[in-house]
From Swiss-Prot:
Gene: hslV
EC number(s) stated in the UniProt entry for this protein: 3.4.25.2
Subunit annotation: A double ring-shaped homohexamer of HslV is capped on each side by a ring-shaped HslU homohexamer. The assembly of the HslU/HslV complex is dependent on binding of ATP.
Keywords linked to the UniProt accession: Allosteric enzyme, Cytoplasm, Hydrolase, Metal-binding, Protease, Sodium, Stress response, Threonine protease
Keyword Cytoplasm: yes
Activity control: Allosterically activated by HslU binding.
Organism annotation: Chlorobium chlorochromatii (strain CaD3)
GO function terms (MF aspect): metal ion binding; threonine-type endopeptidase activity
PANTHER family linked: ATP-DEPENDENT PROTEASE SUBUNIT HSLV, METALLOPROTEASE TLDD
Protein's recorded name: ATP-dependent protease subunit HslV
Binding site for Na(+): A167, C170, T173
The reaction(s) this protein catalyses: ATP-dependent cleavage of peptide bonds with broad specificity
GO CC aspect terms: HslUV protease complex; proteasome core complex
Active site per UniProt: T12
Family of this protein: Belongs to the peptidase T1B family. HslV subfamily.
Length: 182
């Protein structure tokens, strides 16, 4: 029996930066199905836990929203403790047969922590306070690191500029940029 699969859903670049006690997380708005752009203004950033955290997602949208719902429940269960909620979600992601099939990543920032929860159930805390996920993430990450090192731009400005650079390079990233700040 021949296995046929649906076109791969590719969408997004999400980047978050913490600088001088301020955090910003932003994304582009493009969603593609195979080689076709199906939406230009997808909302990929959410405020969580009484507005104290920002979370963004990349990957299959329904999968990402499922994970965000579960993450929010973990935040509530653990009193808003970002690291504990992230580790518990990652543990569930690795051990639950249903969750293991979900294809998404989540980037989360608070004013002092930046984490990535990967599609393999890993919790990653970058040393430099910059998180990036999605198809244009490496372009945005390189831009953000350079801007952090060589400018005095705010976290919000670094996120904005990094996404603009990624949009100029990555075909799965557009310039419909949304940035949220804490």
């Amino acid at each position: 029996m021949k296995h046929t699969s649906l076109p791969e859903i590719r969408s997004t670049t999400v980047i978050g930066v913490i600088r001088n006690g301020q955090a910003a997380l932003g994304s582009d708005g493009q969603m593609t199905l195979g080689n076709t752009v199906v939406k230009h203004s997808t909302k990929k950033i959410r405020r969580l836990y009484q507005g104290k955290l920002l979370a963004g997602f990349a990957g299959a949208t329904a999968d990402a929203l499922t994970l965000l719902d579960r993450f929010e429940a973990k935040l509530e269960a653990f009193g808003g403790k970002l690291e504990r909620a992230s580790v518990e979600l990652a543990r569930d992601w690795r051990t639950d047969k249903y969750l293991r099939r979900l294809e998404a990543m989540i980037a989360i920032v608070s004013n002092d922590r930046a984490l990535i929860i990967s599609g393999t159930g890993d919790v990653i805390e970058p040393e430099d306070g910059i998180v990036a996920i999605g198809s244009g993430s490496m372009y945005a990450l390189a831009a953000a690191r350079s801007l952090m090192k060589h400018t005095s731009l705010s976290a919000q400005e670094i996120v904005q500029e990094s996404l603009a650079i990624a949009a100029d390079i990555c075909i799965y990233t557009n310039n419909h940029i949304v940035v949220e700040e804490l």
